Amino acid sequence: MVKMRVIAGTYRSRQLAAPRGLQTRPTSDRLRETLFNILAPRTVGCHFVDLYAGTGAVGIEAISRGAEHVWFAENAEPALASLRQNLATLKISRGFTLEDRGVGAMLQRLSKLTQPIDVVYLDPPYEAEDEYSGTLNFFGSVRGRAILSADALVIAEHSSKAKLAERYGVLEHTRLLKQGDAALSFFVPAAAEKTRPPDGDQ
C-alpha cells in the first residue's frame, strides 16, 4: 500500500492508504496542500463533492478542515476498498455520503438535494476525456447549475499537458494551476447577467 497523509485540520498527519498499481493515481500531498491553501477561506462549513474519489484523500482533507458534508463517488476496486479503510481508520462515521455505484449515480443523487453544493472536485483518469466533458457539462447545464451555490467552485484535476475547454455551459474557466505532471482547472458559474444578452439586443 502507498502511504499518504492528511495535511491539516482535525486529522492532521494521520496516514492514508492507497493501493499500488497504475489503476489508481492518488492526488499528491503537495497538490492537495496547494488546493486547500486556495480553498482555505471557504472550506469550513462547506458542502463538498469528491468525484472519482479514489482513496478519498481530497474529500477526507475537506472533512479534516471543517467541511459540513462531503459526498464521495467511487466504484472502482481496489480504490473503493482504500477509501472505506481510510474512513474507518480515522473513525469518520458521519458528515459524508459514499456512492459506490459511480459518478453517474452520484449526479442523480445530487440532483435531488435541497442543500446547494459549494465545491466540486473531479479527478477522472487523465486519459478519460469523455468523463471530464460529461461531468463538467452536467454542472454547466441548467440541471447541474441548480445544485451549485451562487459562488460555487468546480475544480478538475488533469494532466498538465491537457487543456480543458474555456467553457462548459454556464461554467467558465477562471484559473489554471500546474504542478509537475498535474494541473488544476478552476471553473465558476457565469454571472446571470453574462448568460443572456442585455435588453434590446437581438
Task: Kindly give the residue locations of the regions a language model identified.
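Class I S-adenosyl-L-methionine-dependent methyltransferase catalytic core
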Residues: 1-202
